[in-house]
Amino acid sequence: MLVWLAEYLVKFYSGFNVFSYLTFRAIVSLLTALFISLWMGPHLIAWLQKLQIGQVVRNDGPESHFSKRGTPTMGGLMILFSITISVLMWAYPSNPYVWCVLFILIGYGIVGFIDDYRKVVRKNTKGLIARWKYFWQSIIALAAAFTMYSIGKDTSATELVVPFFKDIMPQLGLLYVLLAYFVIVGTSNAVNLTDGLDGLAIMPTVFVAAGFALVAWATGNVNFAAYLHIPYLRHAGELVIVCTAIVGAGLGFLWFNTYPAQVFMGDVGSLALGGALGTIAVLLRQEFLLVIMGGVFVVETLSVILQVGSFKLRGQRIFRMAPIHHHYELKGWPEPRVIVRFWIISLMLVLIGLATLKVR
């Protein structure tokens, strides 16, 4: 909203014109979200401790996790607040893509908050019943998917971008809604599954968001979009502001979530961040790129699916424990080693994903 104010003030002082530059707004969006997180963190942690809102730890998990019992959770509130304020300050409020992401971010944040509340306040270890969680995730995702389809149904915004093939961009039509639904819900739950160690989920989220910031900038630039053979989408540029806000809020949260964590994000953070990343990927027409850049989330999810499937079909487990990060813990890897190695893999996958944009 400050952009509109700056457009008015530029009549009195030309220096306010700097607010019209996307790169400037992207930087201040990141810094705004970062500083809000850093400021809010100690206050939120103290408040959560006062209310005794602490993490519930599984009895069948690694023994090293027992010391985490009681650590404040629902820290994702600071992430959501930081992102929302930063985006509202620095993005153009008239941009429909921005509102689609905020709708998912806040909607999934509410679902996650209810789940966390039932777990840590009501002492219900199951939290929100799975079918109700999935129901509300589905309703919110479908509402966003139909909205996004109505915005771009007559443009290249509903084409499917296939990696490595510059001339293959099939028009999805209404299948766009179905794809958007699965990507948003799937990514939300994938990030949620990954959030099992201190800082494990937030840093890959930051890497992927940073990667999508570059993609959004290119997609919203007619010349770079043509150069990379990706669809030019005139609303996409403002998603840079959203992505950099996620990066800033994520780094601010990591300040308190790094090993040993002072606070956990909880479902209020992981479901919302995953949903936001999925929505950004759909809006940019880069669902396949999300699979590559978010490979850590994909592998974590597949490990759970394979573990459950193998146990039901063969009565045997593939991993010592799923998601797969617990498998490595039980093999004797110290928690920081698991975390940092997953970070390195995530960074490599983001770079590989960005490289595929040119390898066509």
Curated annotation (Swiss-Prot):
PROSITE patterns: MRAY_1, MRAY_2
Keyword Membrane: yes
Membrane topology: Multi-pass membrane protein
Catalysed conversion reaction: UDP-N-acetyl-alpha-D-muramoyl-L-alanyl-gamma-D-glutamyl-meso-2,6-diaminopimeloyl-D-alanyl-D-alanine + di-trans,octa-cis-undecaprenyl phosphate = di-trans,octa-cis-undecaprenyl diphospho-N-acetyl-alpha-D-muramoyl-L-alanyl-D-glutamyl-meso-2,6-diaminopimeloyl-D-alanyl-D-alanine + UMP
EC id: 2.7.8.13
Leader peptide range in chain numbering: none
Broad EC category: transferase
GO CC term, one of those recorded: plasma membrane
InterPro entries the record matches: Glycosyl_transferase_4 (IPR000715), PNAcMuramoyl-5peptid_Trfase (IPR003524), PNAcMuramoyl-5peptid_Trfase_CS (IPR018480)
Cofactor: Mg(2+)
Localization annotation: Cell inner membrane
GO annotation (BP), single: cell wall macromolecule biosynthetic process
Transmembrane segments: 27-47, 72-92, 94-114, 132-152, 168-188, 199-219, 236-256, 263-283, 288-308, 338-358
Keywords: Cell cycle, Cell division, Cell inner membrane, Cell membrane, Cell shape, Cell wall biogenesis/degradation, Magnesium, Membrane, Metal-binding, Peptidoglycan synthesis, Transferase, Transmembrane, Transmembrane helix
Pathway entry: Cell wall biogenesis; peptidoglycan biosynthesis
Gene Ontology MF terms: metal ion binding; phospho-N-acetylmuramoyl-pentapeptide-transferase activity; UDP-N-acetylmuramoyl-L-alanyl-D-glutamyl-meso-2,6-diaminopimelyl-D-alanyl-D-alanine:undecaprenyl-phosphate transferase activity
Pfam families: Glycos_transf_4, MraY_sig1
Family affiliation: Belongs to the glycosyltransferase 4 family. MraY subfamily.
Free-text function comment from the UniProt entry: Catalyzes the initial step of the lipid cycle reactions in the biosynthesis of the cell wall peptidoglycan: transfers peptidoglycan precursor phospho-MurNAc-pentapeptide from UDP-MurNAc-pentapeptide onto the lipid carrier undecaprenyl phosphate, yielding undecaprenyl-pyrophosphoryl-MurNAc-pentapeptide, known as lipid I.
Full protein name: Phospho-N-acetylmuramoyl-pentapeptide-transferase
UniProt organism field: Yersinia pestis
